[in-house]
A protein has these predicted regions:
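Glycine-rich phosphate-binding loop signature in dinucleotide/nucleotide-binding domains
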Residues: 40-42, 131-141
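Active-site-proximal alpha-helix that buttresses catalytic centers in soluble enzyme cores
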Residues: 3-66
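Phosphate-handling substructures
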Residues: 63-126
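Beta-strand elements within well-structured catalytic alpha/beta cores of enzymes
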Residues: 4-8, 138-147
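GST superfamily/GST-like fold recognition
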Residues: 149-153
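Domain-level recognition of soluble alpha/beta enzyme cores
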Residues: 160-191
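Short glycine-rich phosphate-binding loop at a beta-alpha junction
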Residues: 44-50, 72, 142-146
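Acidic, His/Gly-rich catalytic cores of divalent-metal-dependent hydrolytic chemistry
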Residues: 189-202
Length: 202
């Protein structure tokens, strides 16, 4: 049996519109998203990061259709804490020595005063695996995850059957990937996401 999962990046926040690094800041959605329409099939379960922008996005997408659909919050899938870079833009940081060093590392080193990239990716994957097992145990056929750009990249980079670069999995706000999970394989310890299709809900 296959479980289909739609991974969706939350709608834009004011910080996203200003191209700021927004990670641990619990921003609400931008006013411009109030009339944004994105159409995704109604899931049996929604797994969301507990941050306001993700929970609000789920409510914006499915609205009144959520009555019979539980939203499960998964703190392990919240966005990375950008430390000293939090709330800043590339323009503000481009002369910052720590930022230059971080860029040269390919974005791998820890953010000064923030979260280690490896730790961040590890917790996202842990959260994903935990929730996939939760869904399989309930024989769910279709679920949606409303999370963050960094979370989607971390999960796809680690678990997708075909190895691709971390940044290859970048998606716009409101877009994401539809993936498949083989229940049998997961039950046998082969924890992979398959058949990725990019979706925008437009």
């Amino acid at each position: 049996n296959m479980l289909k999962i739609m991974l969706i990046r939350h709608f834009a926040t004011p910080g996203n519109e200003k191209r700021q690094y927004i990670g641990s800041t619990d921003e609400v959605l931008s006013e411009k998203t109030a009339f944004l329409k994105r159409s995704y099939p109604i899931p049996e379960y929604i797994i969301a990061s507990p941050m306001k922008r993700c929970v609000q996005t789920a409510k914006r997408i499915w609205g009144t259709d959520l009555s019979g659909c539980p939203i499960v919050l998964e703190p392990l899938m919240r966005e990375c804490d950008f430390g000293q870079f939090e709330g800043k833009t590339y323009e503000q940081l481009k002369k910052n020595a720590a930022y230059i060093k971080w860029l040269k590392s390919g974005g791998i080193t820890a953010f000064p005063g923030g979260e280690d990239q490896e730790e961040f990716r590890k917790r996202c994957v842990e959260g994903m695996k935990k929730q996939v097992r939760f869904l399989i145990a309930r024989h769910v056929k279709y679920a949606a995850f409303v999370v963050h750009g960094g979370t989607i990249m971390a999960v796809m980079h680690a678990l997708y059957e075909e190895k691709k670069d971390f940044y290859n999995w970048q998606v716009e706000n409101g877009s994401g990937y539809l993936v498949s999970v083989s229940e049998k394989e997961w039950e046998n310890g082969i924890e992979l996401l398959k058949n990725a299709e990019k979706r925008s809900g437009r």
